[in-house]
Amino acid sequence: MSESVRTNTSIWSKGMLSVIVAQFLSAFGDNALLFATLALLKAQFYPDWSQPVLQMVFVGAYILFAPFVGQIADSFAKGRVMMVANGLKLAGAAGICLGVNPFVGYTLVGIGAAAYSPAKYGILGELTTGDKLVKANGLMEASTIAAILLGSVAGGVLADWHVIAALVACALAYAGAVAANLFIPKLVAARPGQSWRLSAMTRSCFSACVVLWSNGETRFSLVGTGLFWGAGVTLRFLLVLWVPVALGITDNATPTYLNAMVAVGIVVGAGAAAKLVTLETVSRCMPAGILIGVVVAIFSLQHALLPAYALLLLIGMLGGFFVVPLNALLQERGKKSVGAGNAIAVQNLGENSAMLLMLGLYSLAVLVGVPAVAIGIGFGVLFALAIAALWIWQRRQASY
């Protein structure tokens, strides 16, 4: 069966569709669980400062396990790694349902997510190749964003009805992801027989970082995706602060709806990138990255809901068009140098470090009293300048 998968590189093959379904259910569970667990914290009268800590333990798991998850993904069949990782998520969600401390349960989900990510992206390069890889990434990103959109809404709606019911729904989503993983054919491990000593694995991760950062194309991809996802997480929190100030709306639903517009836009942008950008024309995505920052700055000046929706939809479209080709470039080049699993693990380390850094800077700005609108404008301008600098640097590297 694995042989048939290697010869059938269609993005509509059984193996590829199983990956996409598993990814949708897993991401659906991740996002529904976040809102369901936040509702649980409120119901159990945890202090407000505990809510961002919940996100931090999730992100921290990615950073802590980065030296190890890439080797795990490359040492075993990636479909089976995905299944075990979703099993960890299932255990974490089920534990929260059964009364385990929510921070402990959510940390277990974060560990599962950290192990899952290199395998889910690395397997794309084993199921398809070349320009089809960009299209496969488009499908993956589209399914992920659709799951983020639906999972967030479902988690919030179900939690308003019954918190435990929402948590059970999350566990069922993870169980469905485990079942979908069973339909992914068992492929040959990319790099079997590596050392499992912690010191050796840490050195291996460090070595992968050095190799990828020494290559102009992969360094370009790592910086671009890190900036994008760091900015994306920061924008989510910025919206919560910005809506009451700029729009005069104090409910909890409006920031969620605005975030949903970004998610819808990313689906559209990812689809456009799959059609218009190849591995040889990755630089086409860079103007979209610069425009993200420009549009964020313009968005921050709005005082009406309709233009805010439209601009966030545009931000999402630009984001999807920007990030999908960069992901594909890293997978293709990383697979040949350090293995796809190690490449994605290094990418996760960079992206999550960028998230912590940007959220830290954002929190500092809020702490010293910078107005929300000013934060948005400054954030947009700095992001546009950062992507422009990255593009200039990439063009200079390409000319050597």
UniProtKB/Swiss-Prot annotation:
GO terms for molecular function: lysophospholipid:sodium symporter activity. It is a multi-pass membrane protein. Pfam families: MFS_1. It comes from the Bacteria. The keyword Phosphoprotein does not apply. Its main location: membrane. It is found in: Cell inner membrane. One of its GO terms (cellular component) is plasma membrane. Gene3D superfamilies: MFS general substrate transporter like domains. Belongs to the major facilitator superfamily. LplT (TC 2.A.1.42) family. Catalyzes the facilitated diffusion of 2-acyl-glycero-3-phosphoethanolamine (2-acyl-GPE) into the cell. This is Lysophospholipid transporter LplT. It comes from Salmonella gallinarum (strain 287/91 / NCTC 13346). The gene is lplT.
